[in-house]
UniProtKB/Swiss-Prot annotation:
Protein name, UniProt field: KNR4/SMI1 homolog 2
Organism annotation: Debaryomyces hansenii (strain ATCC 36239 / CBS 767 / BCRC 21394 / JCM 1990 / NBRC 0083 / IGC 2968) (Yeast)
Family membership noted in the UniProt record: Belongs to the KNR4/SMI1 family.
Record's compositionally biased regions (Acidic residues): 516-528, 576-590
Source domain of life: Eukaryota
Bias-annotated ranges (Basic residues): 554-568
Annotated Polar residues bias: 71-85, 430-454
BP terms from Gene Ontology: fungal-type cell wall beta-glucan biosynthetic process
Native organism taxonomy: Eukaryota, Fungi, Dikarya, Ascomycota, Saccharomycotina
Composition-biased stretches (Low complexity): 217-226
Chain intervals for the UniProt region annotation (Disordered): 59-97, 216-239, 407-590
Length: 590
């Protein structure tokens, strides 16, 4: 579209009352037939008048008045002119006694006719002006005939019901981005553009589901043509059939039965109300064998079982208006701080916040608790209210536990064959190779450290129990340090760690009394040797013979002590290494 076309459409939008039709719409002065093509020379308003006339005038062509000719009679008016009057119910009684009320035409169910769309809109507007004026300001103006004609052509579903055309000629839904609540108890009333957008989304969903259903049917046909001779192929086909039957596509139902076509979405369903959760209220232009053209249904994400909630738009809007006039509504004020209906207010100044009074959400409330009683816990959405009313109308008593969404059943898993245990995947996996042998011993998948089995250690970390470590004297300070480290260890050690530590009792456990005696003897010997050294130092010695002198006893003992200390350090390091290896193995096992 070029700049000129954009300018023309802008001028068209500000100079005309069209909401949906374009500036060059070819449907301004033409009607649309059932196929979606235009019929020239016809006017939409004349077609509406004709349909209204056919809806009110009885189709009988025979007169019950004697002397009637071709179902009509001649009557004289006050000015003396004669008029031909066709037969209507109540005509004879109206002529005989004009003071009584005339009889009314009844609908197909034997009920009196419903109010017209215009009268219903008048009642809605009066309620909005009194209770919720801001929501009334949120409504669009009515559409034109050109809008409706182009809308019908874009849908491609044939002619719309007369009630729909009258309904949208009064108001074209709600403003986009207006109040956060919908007109119909929280359900947003879509305009013509919104209907086209929702219809396009559901058309894509329907197209994808049709492809999936076609693939399922094609696979079933192939399996029927290729009837397998082996039992394995038969089990596969049976499992595939169960999978198809367990999907939501094959479990679409309706209440009453056969009133709605068993599809998840259909091109003949025109949504005009939505709850922004994937559920819609729509006009059904392609009903089932037991349905009626133009009936109002609920379909969507939570409704695998579709419901017929009204036979036409007039009946649906009449129920909504009745709820408003009976007081079965509530304007939620929880989001407004200091509002007129806020329960947290304790002051007496009710003028504060009155401007924010009508900013909440419009929702349903059973005022006198006659319809649902005390069974309602929390708020009921209007879709849930319509659902329960429809179920009650069609004789379903268990209203609260009835679910309209399909829940697939759990399919039994086939047991693995014996040959499957030897498969390369199972053989390579450590969980299938090592863990299967110990399944009967313990249910815990971790290694049971308290069992009698021992974990194999590497050769470098094995300790030979036959080797005897020579007893060596250990100092008292070293014994205390070893005892302190042993006491600081956690109590939750495994038996492997305890066994490794207990293999060295001879090195750690030495009697304290023997150590004290040995230390006293060593100290006495050292004192004697020191005295002898002082005596020897007084005698002159040559510097040349100093290097050739043999080592004294004290020097030898000092060297032996150093060697012993080095050996003890090496042994302690070995025990520490063994403990670290045991802890690492325990961590790996856990």
């Amino acid at each position: 579209m070029g700049i000129i076309d954009n300018f023309k459409s802008f001028v068209h939008s500000i100079t005309t009352e069209d909401h949906y039709a374009s500036y060059d719409s070819p449907y301004k002065n033409s009607a649309v037939n059932n196929v979606g093509t235009t019929v020239g020379g016809g006017n939409s308003s004349s077609r509406l008048h004709e349909l209204n006339r056919l809806a009110t005038v009885n189709s009988s062509s025979h007169s019950l008045i004697e002397g009637g000719n071709n179902g009509s009679r001649t009557s004289l008016s006050r000015n003396g002119s004669s008029t031909t009057v066709g037969y209507r119910p109540g005509l004879r009684s109206s002529n005989t006694n004009s003071s009584e009320l005339q009889l009314q035409n009844l609908n197909a169910s034997g009920q009196p006719p419903l109010p017209s769309i215009d009268s219903l809109w008048d009642r809605i507007e009066s309620w909005l002006e009194e209770e919720y004026p801001e929501l009334g300001d949120n409504l669009n103006d009515g559409v034109t005939t050109a809008d409706l004609n182009e809308f019908e052509n874009d849908l491609g579903c044939g002619s719309l019901p007369v009630e729909i055309r009258q309904f949208y000629k009064r108001h074209d839904g709600q403003f986009r981005g207006g109040k956060p609540t919908g007109l119909v108890m929280g359900l947003t009333l879509l305009d013509l553009e919104g209907i086209i957008e929702e219809y396009a989304i559901w058309a894509k969903v329907n197209q994808r589901l049709e492809k999936q259903q076609y693939m399922f049917q094609h696979q079933q046909q192939q399996q029927q043509h290729q009837k397998a001779t082996s039992s394995a192929d038969a089990s596969e086909t049976h499992g595939h059939e169960n999978k198809i039957n367990n999907s939501f596509i094959a479990n679409q139902k309706s209440i009453p039965p056969n009133a709605i076509q068993p599809y998840y979405a259909h091109r003949g369903w025109i949504p005009f109300l939505k709850d922004f959760c994937g559920n819609q209220i729509a006009i059904d232009l392609a009903p089932g064998p037991q349905g009626h053209w133009g009936q109002i249904i609920i379909f969507g994400r939570d409704y695998d079982t579709k419901l017929v909630i009204a036979s036409n738009l007039q009946e649906f809007m009449f129920g909504f208006v009745s709820d408003l006039e009976l007081g079965n509504f509530q304007i939620d004020q929880n989001d407004q701080d200091g509002g007129f209906l806020d329960g947290s207010r304790n002051d007496d100044d009710y003028m504060i916040g009155d401007g924010e009074e009508d900013q909440g959400e419009l929702c349903f409330r059973d005022r006198e608790q006659k319809e649902f009683g005390n069974s309602i816990k929390g708020k009921l959405t209007y879709l849930e209210v319509l659902k329960r009313r429809a179920l009650k109308t069609f004789g379903i008593t268990n209203l609260e536990k009835f679910s309209t969404s399909f829940t697939p059943q759990r399919m039994p898993h086939a047991k693995p064959n014996a040959s499957g245990m030897a498969s390369p995947v199972r053989a390579a996996s450590p969980s299938m190779s090592g863990a299967t042998a110990n399944t009967n011993k313990s249910q815990n998948p971790l290694i049971n450290m308290e069992s009698s089995s021992k974990v194999a250690l590497p050769k470098e970390t094995l300790i030979d129990e036959d080797e005897k470590v020579p007893e060596e004297p250990v100092k008292k300070s070293e014994v205390k340090s070893v005892k302190n480290t042993a006491a600081a260890e956690p109590e939750k050690e495994t038996k492997q760690k305890d066994e490794i530590i207990e293999e060295k009792p001879e090195v750690i456990e030495t009697p304290a009394k023997e150590d004290d005696k040995e230390e006293e003897e060593e100290e006495q010997e050292e004192e004697k040797e020191q005295e002898k050294e002082h005596e020897n130092e007084e005698a002159p010695e040559d510097e040349q013979n100093e290097d050739a002198k043999p080592l004294t006893k004290t020097q030898k003992k000092n060297q032996s002590k150093k060697a012993k200390k080095q050996q003890q350090k090496q042994k302690q390091n070995e025990t520490n290494d063994v403990e670290e290896v045991a802890e690492d193995l325990n961590d790996v096992a856990l």
